[in-house]
């Protein structure tokens, strides 16, 4: 039986962080299709315009144009149930709570790694 292709939306404004996340996703077995958005506004557009729903959204916190909290709220406001995992270098309880309140399903800290993403993929049954 063939493994399901995993579609991920990676929302991150820093190119180096996108490169690291993409490599970690591939190493963890979850990088079949990775679309990128450099800010929250583009992320909302990508989710809205996607031909098929994403299996996972990795959402940065601080970005220009629209931050991760607002993008998460807007995606949830569209009725999208795709797991959203907040990603930030700030792991303060207030930051985690703000993302969860906005509609995120989980939180992980930067830098992303094969191990961290492996746990996330397993949690959402994508591995």
Curated annotation (Swiss-Prot):
Domain Response regulatory: 7-125
PROSITE patterns in the cross-refs: RESPONSE_REGULATORY
PTM remark: Two-component system major event consists of a His-to-Asp phosphorelay between a sensor histidine kinase (HK) and a response regulator (RR). In plants, the His-to-Asp phosphorelay involves an additional intermediate named Histidine-containing phosphotransfer protein (HPt). This multistep phosphorelay consists of a His-Asp-His-Asp sequential transfer of a phosphate group between first a His and an Asp of the HK protein, followed by the transfer to a conserved His of the HPt protein and finally the transfer to an Asp in the receiver domain of the RR protein.
Residues annotated with 4-aspartylphosphate modification: 60
Ranges that cross the membrane: none
Gene3D superfamilies in the record: 3.40.50.2300
InterPro entries the record matches: CheY-like_superfamily, Sig_transdc_resp-reg_receiver, ST_Response_Regulator
A GO BP annotation: cytokinin-activated signaling pathway
Keyword entries, A-Z: Activator, Cytokinin signaling pathway, Phosphoprotein, Two-component regulatory system
Stored SMART domains: REC
Pfam families cross-referenced by the UniProt entry: Response_reg
Effect of loss of the gene: Dwarf, narrow leaf and low tillering phenotypes.
Sequence similarity: Belongs to the ARR family. Type-C subfamily.
Function text: Functions as a response regulator involved in His-to-Asp phosphorelay signal transduction system. Phosphorylation of the Asp residue in the receiver domain activates the ability of the protein to promote the transcription of target genes. May directly activate some type-A response regulators in response to cytokinins.
Protein name: Two-component response regulator ORR41
Annotated source species: Oryza sativa subsp. japonica
């Amino acid at each position: 039986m063939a493994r399901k292709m995993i579609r991920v939306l990676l929302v991150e404004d820093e190119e180096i962080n996108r490169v690291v996340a993409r490599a970690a996703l591939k190493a963890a077995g979850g990088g079949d299709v990775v679309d990128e958005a450099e800010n929250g506004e583009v992320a909302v557009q990508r989710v809205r315009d996607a031909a098929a729903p994403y299996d996972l959204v990795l959402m940065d916190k601080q970005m220009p144009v629209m931050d991760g909290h607002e993008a998460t709220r807007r995606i949830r406001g569209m009725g999208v149930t795709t797991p959203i995992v907040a990603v930030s270098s700030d792991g303060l309880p207030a930051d985690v709570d703000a993302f969860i309140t906005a509609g995120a399903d989980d939180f992980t800290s930067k830098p992303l790694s094969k191990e961290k993403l492996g746990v996330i993929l397993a949690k959402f049954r994508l591995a």
